[in-house]
């Protein structure tokens, strides 16, 4: 597996504070039962959320989709 780094995510969302908010929100959604958009491979929700962001499958729009 390719290691997900903050730099990979910052290419998609240049503001690190917005990126952190989006990743935390998406991780909360995943922990509450949302379907992962990438292969979770037994990773924790936070890692899966970062993998989704690095792959370009999730962005700032996750903050506007309602409650986690």
From Swiss-Prot:
Q: What is this protein called?
A: DNA-directed RNA polymerase subunit omega
- Specify whether Transmembrane helix is a keyword of the entry: no
**Cellular-component GO terms for this entry:** DNA-directed RNA polymerase complex
Task: List its EC numbers.
Answer: 2.7.7.6
Q: Name one GO biological process term.
A: DNA-templated transcription
Q: Quick check: keyword Transferase in the entry?
A: yes
For this protein's source organism, the top of the classification is: Bacteria, Pseudomonadati, Pseudomonadota, Betaproteobacteria, Rhodocyclales
Q: Which PANTHER family match?
A: DNA-DIRECTED RNA POLYMERASE SUBUNIT OMEGA (PTHR34476:SF1)
Keywords for this protein: DNA-directed RNA polymerase, Nucleotidyltransferase, Transcription, Transferase
Q: What pairs make up the disulfide bonds?
A: none
Q: Which gene encodes it?
A: rpoZ
Output the Gene3D superfamilies linked to this UniProt entry. 3.90.940.10
Q: How does it assemble?
A: The RNAP catalytic core consists of 2 alpha, 1 beta, 1 beta' and 1 omega subunit. When a sigma factor is associated with the core the holoenzyme is formed, which can initiate transcription.
What does this protein's UniProt record list under function? Promotes RNA polymerase assembly. Latches the N- and C-terminal regions of the beta' subunit thereby facilitating its interaction with the beta and alpha subunits.
What is the protein's species of origin? Dechloromonas aromatica (strain RCB)
For this UniProt entry, the molecular function terms from Gene Ontology, in alphabetical order, are: DNA binding; DNA-directed RNA polymerase activity
Q: Which reaction does it catalyse?
A: RNA(n) + a ribonucleoside 5'-triphosphate = RNA(n+1) + diphosphate
Family, according to the entry, reads as follows: Belongs to the RNA polymerase subunit omega family.
Q: Which domain of life is it from?
A: Bacteria
């Amino acid at each position: 597996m390719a290691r997900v780094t903050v730099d990979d995510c910052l290419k998609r969302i240049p503001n690190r504070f917005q990126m952190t908010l989006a990743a935390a929100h998406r991780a909360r959604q995943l922990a509450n039962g949302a379907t992962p958009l990438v292969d979770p491979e037994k990773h924790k929700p936070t890692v899966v959320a970062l993998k989704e962001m690095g792959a370009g499958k999730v962005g700032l729009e996750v903050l506007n989709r309602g409650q986690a």
